[in-house]
């Protein structure tokens, strides 16, 4: 029986690390993709030692076309699971942001998701089985603060929903998870001040991963972890977009996301 393989982008911290640890615990071999080669190797060594599984490291900056091509080539060889987790936000206002940084954000958040999914699907379809989990954000479902980041995540949601319809009957599952605020390094790295966010709005990585995999197993396409975020997104769909934007400006207390 072939070994099950999961390829995960951005696995060295936060949600990506949570997925890596969970799939390792479930007996999968791993392909870990990150631009942080040192942390990547340390995580791979730890997970290999724990279960004797094969953990392949693939250092890559998904903002660079050549590195995306390298990861795509690995995917054409076949994996059972692809988790497109890598992504980032930037701080400051859109009109003062470095255009190159904004383009890099789209390269990682959008282009890599498209390219890696395209590379992975043919082998999954041929096998009649496979799972793609795209990590978006609740920001992709809400009108309001945030421009490039929120738009990139809205693209991921729409992309996943469209493919989920097209892949019906193939045995391949397409899923997108839209977390809210999660205790990770994400906001610190982006320079976003989160000190005023109420404690009840925070989610834990393990809970996000657990809910995602449970909902994916049940066939759900758009996965929103946490009852608070289910309530917020449901309410947002029921009111005019102008009111939704106003509510989001209050809810989105983290300032400075572009």
Regions picked out by a protein language model, each given a short descriptive name:
Residues 117, 152:
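Active-site helix of classical SDR
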Residues 12-13:
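Conserved glycine-rich cofactor-binding loop
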Residues 137:
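Residue(s) in the substrate-gating loop at a strand-loop-helix junction
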Residues 85-90:
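Conserved NAD(P)H cofactor-binding loop of Rossmann-fold oxidoreductase domains
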């Amino acid at each position: 029986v072939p070994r099950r393989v999961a390829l995960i982008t951005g696995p060295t911290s936060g949600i990506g690390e949570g997925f890596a640890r969970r799939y390792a615990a479930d007996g999968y071999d791993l392909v870990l993709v990150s631009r942080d080669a040192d942390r990547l190797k340390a995580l791979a060594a730890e997970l290999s030692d724990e279960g004797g599984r094969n953990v392949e490291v693939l250092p890559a900056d998904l903002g660079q076309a050549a590195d995306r091509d390298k990861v795509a080539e690995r995917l054409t060889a076949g994996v059972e699971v692809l988790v497109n987790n890598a992504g980032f936000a930037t701080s400051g206002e859109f009109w003062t942001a470095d255009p190159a940084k904004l383009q890099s954000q789209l390269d990682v958040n959008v282009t890599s998701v498209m390219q890696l999914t395209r590379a992975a699907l043919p082998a999954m379809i041929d096998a009649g089985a496979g799972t793609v989990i795209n990590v978006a954000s609740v920001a992709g479902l809400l009108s309001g603060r945030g421009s490039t980041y929120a738009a990139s995540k809205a693209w991921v949601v729409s992309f996943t929903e469209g493919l989920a319809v097209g892949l019906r009957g193939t045995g391949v599952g397409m899923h997108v998870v839209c977390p809210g605020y999660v205790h990770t390094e994400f906001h610190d790295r982006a320079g976003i001040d989160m000190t005023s966010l109420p404690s009840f709005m925070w989610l834990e990585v393990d809970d996000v991963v657990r809910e995602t995999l449970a909902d994916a197993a049940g066939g759900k396409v758009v996965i929103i972890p946490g009852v608070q975020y289910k309530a917020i997104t449901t309410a947002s769909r029921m009111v005019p977009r102008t009111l939704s934007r106003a509510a989001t400006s209050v809810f989105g207390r983290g300032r400075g996301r572009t």
